[in-house]
């Protein structure tokens, strides 16, 4: 895909993880440019894609049930929770099918420590940025395109301040869990100053 070529051309040297929805060809495009990247399905998108098959009065119970799967402490516990989930919700085959097609991505989460997993399934920075843009642009019409660009630029500056002062919770634990894997350790060491 062109987007990954553009990232490479702009200087991105390595990508460890990519969280994406199931758009056809996207995973192959990512892997062709960043072959060492781990491609992960976005849990939020999987929930959204499956919940459309669930009656609204059952949303909360359904999401709590699936959270027991991806939030499990181990792969064995996740597989057990998944079996329970399938048995509990099999009256909605459309919802179950979404998870069956993508369960391999849930399983691969457990190749990493709990701190890494939490970041992989709870962080969706791009959607957060898009949501922020929608908030500032829904205020009305703009006299011209340049006015819109200025507003978006100012919002980006505000977000940048947050990003510069913010931090990823438990980052030292995440880093240590990644450093246990020699493949990640060698890649991380290229970018860390000691």
Regions found by a protein language model. Give the residues of each.
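Amphipathic, well-packed alpha-helical segments that form the structural scaffold of globular domains
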Residues: 4-5, 100, 104, 130, ...
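Short, conserved catalytic/metal-binding motifs centered on acidic residues
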Residues: 18-21, 45, 99, 126-130, ...
């Amino acid at each position: 895909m062109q987007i990954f070529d553009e990232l490479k051309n702009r200087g991105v040297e390595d990508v460890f993880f990519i969280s994406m929805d199931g758009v056809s060809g996207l995973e192959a495009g990512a892997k062709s440019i960043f072959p060492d990247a781990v491609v992960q399905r976005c849990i939020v998108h999987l929930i959204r894609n499956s919940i459309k098959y669930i009656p609204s009065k059952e949303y909360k119970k359904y999401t709590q049930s699936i959270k027991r799967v991806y939030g499990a402490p181990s792969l064995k516990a996740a597989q057990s929770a998944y079996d329970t989930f399938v048995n509990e919700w099999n009256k909605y085959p459309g919802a179950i099918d979404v998870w069956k097609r993508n369960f391999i991505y849930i399983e691969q989460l457990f190749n990493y420590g709990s701190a890494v997993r939490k970041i992989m399934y709870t962080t969706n920075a791009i959607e957060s940025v898009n949501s922020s843009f929608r908030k500032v642009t829904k205020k009305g019409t703009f006299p011209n395109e340049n006015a819109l660009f200025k507003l978006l630029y100012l919002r980006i500056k505000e977000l940048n301040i947050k990003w510069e002062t913010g931090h990823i919770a438990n980052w030292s634990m995440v880093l240590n869990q990644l450093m246990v894997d020699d493949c990640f350790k060698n890649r991380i060491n290229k970018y860390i100053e000691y």
